[in-house]
Design a protein with these regions (language model features):
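Short coil-to-beta-strand transition motifs
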Residues: 133-142
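Acidic-enriched and Gly/Ser
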Residues: 2-130, 146-147, 152-155, 159-177
Length: 178
């Protein structure tokens, strides 16, 4: 069970429409709560002009870093913001360790064009070799080299187990095979 006095990364859901004016990640940021939502670039049209903006890559997924006692009243007050619950456990929300989450956020922010994968999208054919990054913004990271058919870009796979994975571009000069 989670101790109530420690800030933790909670996995949460936002059930609002995709075009909502104030999605949960913006609402929680306004409340000065630390939120991470995996984002992607999207080209849309507003008033006849094409506009490039960032939108969540998985619409209902967000990671919130705070105390459970701070989040519980918000979840009770706003029915579209919910915890994701662990299966076969009674009222225990999903969490991600601080170390894993910080590693994931750092990897995503180091790449201009991260490519997100759901666990079921990763096939054994995509996973090549174990690598370590030596130098650059991702220095010290270890993981799997991801190959996508037809792409010359080298990507390191950084995972949040059972939730999400991201392939971040890596300069070949920083790659060391393990």
């Amino acid at each position: 069970m989670i101790t109530e006095k420690k800030a933790t990364w909670f996995v949460m859901r936002d059930l609002k429409r995709a075009n909502a004016k104030l999605p949960a990640y913006k609402f929680l940021q306004e409340k000065n709560i630390r939120v991470f939502t995996p984002m992607r670039w999207y080209l849309s049209e507003e008033k006849g002009k094409k506009v490039r903006k960032q939108v969540p890559c998985v619409r209902d997924l967000l990671f919130v870093y705070d105390y459970r006692e701070t989040l519980d009243p918000i979840v009770e007050l706003i029915p579209t913001i919910q915890y994701r619950w662990l299966r076969n456990r009674y009222r225990e929300p999903m969490t991600v360790s601080d170390v894993e989450m910080e590693r994931f956020i750092r990897a995503v922010s180091a790449s201009e064009s991260p490519k997100y994968f759901l666990p079921e999208e990763i096939t054994p054919d995509m996973l090549n070799r174990k690598i370590r990054i030596v130098g650059g913004p991702l220095d010290g990271y270890e993981g799997t080299l991801v190959s996508t058919r037809g792409s010359k870009v080298k990507r390191l796979l950084v995972e949040l187990p059972d939730l999400l994975a991201v392939g971040v571009e890596v300069n070949p000069e920083y790659i060391q095979l393990i």
